Amino acid sequence: MARHPRWTLSQVTELFGKPLLELLFEAQQIHRQHFDPQQVQVSTLLSIKTGACPEDCKYCPQSSRYKTGLEAERLMEVEQVLDSARKAKNAGSTRFCMGAAWRNPHERDMPYLEKIVQGVKAMGLETCMTLGMLNESQAQRLANAGLDYYNHNLDTSPEFYGNIITTRTYQERLDTLEKVREAGIKVCSGGIVGLGETVTDRAGLLLQLANLPTPPESVPINMLVKVKGTPLADNDDVDAFDFIRTIAVARIMMPTSYVRLSAGREQMNEQTQAMCFMAGANSIFYGCKLLTTPNPAEDKDLQLFRKLGLNPQQTRVLAGDNEQQQRLEQTLMTPDTDDYYNAAAL
């Protein structure tokens, strides 16, 4: 028997058509029913493998098809990733996200990925990865390693998707999300505002996300970062109120999900970000760079938090994590142990 969708396109379109202040009021009420309005979840994102991606996503400077001046980099060493995670934790992040610019991981990559998940988890951080498409075995191996979240964005509506990406189908994205969910990993999935889509496309994106069998636990909403050399470099700027409206609708449709202000915050002033938090955003990426694009410096974010009376959300760290971390890091970085993994050898 087919599952009845939670939302219809007409309902979502009606939300987008509401007066902005009325929409914000509704979103804030729903937000307060499920979250502490003063708490913001803080994540850090690291590119563990940069550039030379075979996909043709028109917004992405990491695609090998576009001349953006980005230099490709090989997989980072395990100890480099763990050092970055340690710095992120010391700076206040509670979740460490790792991204690799490829279509999908190969089997030879899995031991490396498992080791860094285990190493970051041992620090008491939540873990997230974005690695492209996964098969069932890969999703289960990451779950067994302790991965908390897997990010795989839908980007836009099914109807507009073909204008942005041709090397991967929308259904393939949905299939990956299903495999991740079946493996027991939490889902992180959102999209991008500013690709040239219509309001109906924005409604269609949120409709897809909210009507998944289980909505994503984390929903990143990105504002397009226009990069010279990509096909979308000359797109029109996104109106701030349109972006805020998208955040509010996401909050109303997915009341228990974390809604993250993701890429594009460097282009937003403090007032726009404040209204996004009022609209129900309660998660940010923290650090000077998101994969390859600029992000506000940590100090700037902390100043904004103080102005707004916001606090970084804390996670509970189990006793013994520090000892576990030391043992695991020693094992991972000692060449004569069975668990040692040298990424440069790939």
Curated annotation (Swiss-Prot):
Metabolic or biological pathway, per its Swiss-Prot or TrEMBL entry:
Cofactor biosynthesis; biotin biosynthesis; biotin from 7,8-diaminononanoate: step 2/2
Mind telling me which InterPro entries this protein's record contains?
Answer: Aldolase_TIM, BATS_dom, Biotin_synth/BioAB, Biotin_synthase, Elp3/MiaA/NifB-like_rSAM, rSAM
Needed cofactors, names only, are: [4Fe-4S] cluster; [2Fe-2S] cluster
Q: Which UniProt keywords apply?
A: 2Fe-2S, 4Fe-4S, Biotin biosynthesis, Iron, Iron-sulfur, Metal-binding, S-adenosyl-L-methionine, Transferase
Name the PROSITE patterns on file.
RADICAL_SAM
So where does [2Fe-2S] cluster get bound? 97, 128, 188, 260
Cofactor annotation comment: Binds 1 [4Fe-4S] cluster. The cluster is coordinated with 3 cysteines and an exchangeable S-adenosyl-L-methionine.
Q: Which domain of life is it from?
A: Bacteria
Which residues of this UniProt protein bind [4Fe-4S] cluster? 53, 57, 60
Q: In what residue span(s) does the Radical SAM core domain sit?
A: 38-256
Q: Tell me the Gene3D superfamilies matching this sequence.
A: Aldolase class I
Which reactions fall under this protein's catalytic activity?
A: (4R,5S)-dethiobiotin + (sulfur carrier)-SH + 2 reduced [2Fe-2S]-[ferredoxin] + 2 S-adenosyl-L-methionine = (sulfur carrier)-H + biotin + 2 5'-deoxyadenosine + 2 L-methionine + 2 oxidized [2Fe-2S]-[ferredoxin]
CDD domains registered for this protein in UniProt: Radical_SAM (cd01335)
MF terms (GO), sorted A to Z: 2 iron, 2 sulfur cluster binding; 4 iron, 4 sulfur cluster binding; biotin synthase activity; iron ion binding
Q: What SMART domains does the record point to?
A: BATS, Elp3
GO terms classed as biological process: biotin biosynthetic process
What single Pfam family name could you report for this chain, choosing any that match? Radical_SAM
Task: Tell me which family the UniProt entry assigns to this protein.
Answer: Belongs to the radical SAM superfamily. Biotin synthase family.
Q: What does it do?
A: Catalyzes the conversion of dethiobiotin (DTB) to biotin by the insertion of a sulfur atom into dethiobiotin via a radical-based mechanism.
Please name the PANTHER family in this protein's record: BIOTIN SYNTHASE (PTHR22976), BIOTIN SYNTHASE, MITOCHONDRIAL (PTHR22976:SF2)
Q: How does it assemble?
A: Homodimer.
In Swiss-Prot or TrEMBL terms, this protein is called Biotin synthase
Name the species this protein comes from: Salmonella choleraesuis (strain SC-B67)
